[in-house]
Amino acid sequence: MSTRAPHILMVGGGTGGHVYPAIAIADAVRALRPDAQIVFAGTQDRLEARAVPEAGYALHPITAQGLQRRAVASNLLLPFRVAQGLVQSWRLVGAIEPDVAVGTGGYVAAPVLMAAWLRGRPLLIQEQNAYAGLTNRVLARLALRIHLAFPEAKDWVPAEHAVVSGNPTRQSLRDADPDAARAAFNVPEDGRVLLVMGGSLGSAAINGAIQRILDPLLAEGDVHVVWQTGTRYYDDLTEDLDEHPRLRVVEYIDQMGHAYAAADLAVCRAGALTCSELTVTGTPAVLVPSPNVTADHQTKNARSLERAGAAVWLDEADLDAHLETVLLDLLGNSDRRARMAEAARDRARPDAAETIARDVLALADRYRTN
């Protein structure tokens, strides 16, 4: 067996749901094998262009475009960009000679993993959602190993190569101290905290629904609302909202470990990483799936956690009719919240990143190029 350091090619892009799991896996690989040579492939105009270099890894640009379901005219250039991306990926794989290629989804993963497979490199895929995305569903047929976050995803990939290992999450989420977290949000020991968030950009539906029921929530004398509005909605909401000693409105929460540690209950979207963060932190939640995602995968995520007893699922269309009642009932029922928290932790896979990293290194050792 060769003694040279393993060479690993990572690819996953477009959104945080694809980018951050790739970074977490790379970090875990580096923790296990500090000598590992890890490089990323991705686009130059999406999240990975900023997040990957900030995490300390080199990013090799690949031209890529997904199928546009709304802006149909832009699909005219799709064949040319796919071909360009394949040529770039072929050259990249030839230059770095990876022992294994790891994909976490997003359309940029398609040309890179296809080029790696055509050059005889083993593929490992990580799927974050209960319903596997298009790129991963196609490439899973070529992969030697498929790591899943939800057991339901086994229905969409070759079962003989699949293992349920969870989504990689940040260690800082699990290290946060609840007392320090509550102090950071000025919440007393006996306060009940509702955490509201709709992603980094925000959710118009969740923000609007919370704004309409804010008065009855704060009428509960010990309820504190920590509200991440998202960048799109912060200015307008803060202009409309009156100040209140138990209301904390922020554009974005950098220390999410503190937010989860302080929360008694969350209301949020049902993206894959959010669901995984809820489970590893044991945070009961009301999940409001976004209707604007491919294959309605957030609803499938929400259903999975609701079936496990870890969350309550509400459609966007039902927020005005039911959100106030659901939130007040849960905030008033500590026993049910405790059961939901326990069910969430039962679904958690806190060692997901390390589990996947060990598999990456095992494949690299088995298929070392020289």
Curated annotation (Swiss-Prot):
Pfam families for the chain: Glyco_tran_28_C, Glyco_transf_28
Main location: membrane
InterPro entries assigned to the protein according to its UniProt record, in alphabetical order: GlcNAc_MurG (IPR006009), Glyco_trans_28_C (IPR007235), GlycoTrans_28_N (IPR004276)
Catalytic activity line of the entry: di-trans,octa-cis-undecaprenyl diphospho-N-acetyl-alpha-D-muramoyl-L-alanyl-D-glutamyl-meso-2,6-diaminopimeloyl-D-alanyl-D-alanine + UDP-N-acetyl-alpha-D-glucosamine = di-trans,octa-cis-undecaprenyl diphospho-[N-acetyl-alpha-D-glucosaminyl-(1->4)]-N-acetyl-alpha-D-muramoyl-L-alanyl-D-glutamyl-meso-2,6-diaminopimeloyl-D-alanyl-D-alanine + UDP + H(+)
GO MF terms, alphabetically ordered: UDP-N-acetyl-D-glucosamine:N-acetylmuramoyl-L-alanyl-D-glutamyl-meso-2,6-diaminopimelyl-D-alanyl-D-alanine-diphosphoundecaprenol 4-beta-N-acetylglucosaminlytransferase activity; undecaprenyldiphospho-muramoylpentapeptide beta-N-acetylglucosaminyltransferase activity
Membrane topology: Peripheral membrane protein
EC code: 2.4.1.227
Biological pathway: Cell wall biogenesis; peptidoglycan biosynthesis
A GO biological-process term: peptidoglycan biosynthetic process
Record has Amino-acid biosynthesis as a keyword: no
Positions annotated to bind UDP-N-acetyl-alpha-D-glucosamine: T15, G16, G17, N129, R170, S200, I253, Q298
Location within or outside the cell: Cell inner membrane
Family: Belongs to the glycosyltransferase 28 family. MurG subfamily.
Free-text function comment from the UniProt entry: Cell wall formation. Catalyzes the transfer of a GlcNAc subunit on undecaprenyl-pyrophosphoryl-MurNAc-pentapeptide (lipid intermediate I) to form undecaprenyl-pyrophosphoryl-MurNAc-(pentapeptide)GlcNAc (lipid intermediate II).
NCBIfam families: murG (TIGR01133)
Protein name as it appears in the record: UDP-N-acetylglucosamine--N-acetylmuramyl-(pentapeptide) pyrophosphoryl-undecaprenol N-acetylglucosamine transferase
